[in-house]
């Protein structure tokens, strides 16, 4: 127990305030630079206004078109290729195959099911 007394840190107000001042003075240049950069580079936000733009149905339709288009088809092909490679090396399980095939069915079947239920074109 005596060996720990040599390394014991005695904190009082003076040493604690000195430690805090050392930390603050070492961080001051970077904090000052960050504050100066944020003040000098501020400007109006380039966000879309709430009143203008498109309605939510158009945005959802654009997302569906993106997912069900060539991007989604590429993802489906890559998933099937990954299953084939996994199966070739003996790493594929029935759960993996069911998950990928189920995801593809849900991804491409949701649009058809939604149009069928709502009577859309």
Curated annotation (Swiss-Prot):
Key words of the record: Cell outer membrane, Crown gall tumor, Membrane, Plasmid, Signal, Transmembrane, Transmembrane helix
Disulfide pairs here are: none
Query: Where is it located?
Result: Cell outer membrane
Membrane topology annotation: Multi-pass membrane protein
GO terms under cellular component: cell outer membrane
List where the protein spans the membrane.
Answer: 65-85, 94-114
According to its UniProt entry, the function of this protein is described as: VirB proteins are suggested to act at the bacterial surface and there play an important role in directing T-DNA transfer to plant cells.
**Family per UniProt?**
Belongs to the virB2 family.
**Stated name of the protein:** Protein virB2
Where does this protein come from, organism-wise? Agrobacterium tumefaciens (strain 15955)
What gene, per UniProt, encodes this protein? virB2
């Amino acid at each position: 127990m005596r060996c720990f007394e040599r390394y014991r840190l005695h904190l009082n107000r003076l040493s604690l305030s000195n430690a805090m001042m050392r930390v603050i003075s070492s961080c001051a240049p970077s904090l000052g630079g960050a504050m100066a950069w944020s003040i000098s580079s501020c400007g109006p936000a380039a966000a879309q206004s709430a009143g203008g733009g498109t309605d939510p149905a158009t945005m959802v339709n654009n997302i569906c078109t993106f997912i069900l288009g060539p991007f989604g088809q590429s993802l489906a092909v890559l998933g099937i290729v990954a299953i084939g490679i996994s199966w070739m090396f003996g790493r594929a399980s029935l759960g993996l195959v069911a998950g990928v095939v189920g995801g593809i069915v849900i991804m491409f079947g949701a649009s058809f099911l939604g149009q069928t239920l709502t009577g859309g074109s």
